[in-house]
A protein has these predicted regions:
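A cross-domain feature marking catalytic cores of carbohydrate-active enzymes
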Residues: 1-5, 31-36, 98-100
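Aromatic-rich peripheral "rim/lid" segments of glycoside hydrolase catalytic domains that contact
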Residues: 10-26, 36-141
């Protein structure tokens, strides 16, 4: 399953249903390309067709100077809930992979609108773990 997620557009229960369905077929789920965009979703856009492109508008790039605590907290909660899901179904999951190492190199900064600033990974622009990483590690212990 490809994991380009958008905060507010993805439901953990849908992922749970997908994992269970795949497991019922006797195979293991494989998550690839995990990231979580916190930016507004233009035109209710979904998918990753590289030819898709929307015009830049400032209201679609509200976090250029930093992520507000409200959005950071919402993203943290999504990641925690997602990892709880992965742990609940670990026997049914073969692998989990990420799309990028840190926010500075994330494709989400330029897709589908070039020049936006997103915070889609678990590591900041300097490659340092975000606070949620410690919380995820505690879940796994």
């Amino acid at each position: 399953m490809q994991g380009h997620m958008i905060l507010g557009d993805n439901d953990i229960q849908e992922y749970e249903h997908s994992i269970s369905t795949i497991a019922s077929l006797g195979v293991k789920a494989f998550f690839s390309e995990l990231d979580l965009s916190v930016l507004p979703n233009p035109y209710n856009f979904s998918g990753a067709n590289i030819s898709d492109n929307f015009a830049y508008r400032a209201e679609l790039d509200p976090y250029k100077s930093g992520l507000p605590k409200r959005q950071e907290t919402a993203a943290e909660q999504f990641w925690i809930d997602f990892y709880k899901l992965l742990l609940r179904h670990q026997k049914d999951i073969l692998r989990v992979g990420f799309w990028c190492l840190h926010d500075g190199c994330s494709w989400r900064n330029d897709f589908p609108i070039h020049g936006r600033t997103d915070y889609a990974t678990l590591f900041d622009r300097q490659g340092q773990p975000k606070p949620v990483v410690k919380k995820i590690i505690q879940l796994v212990k």
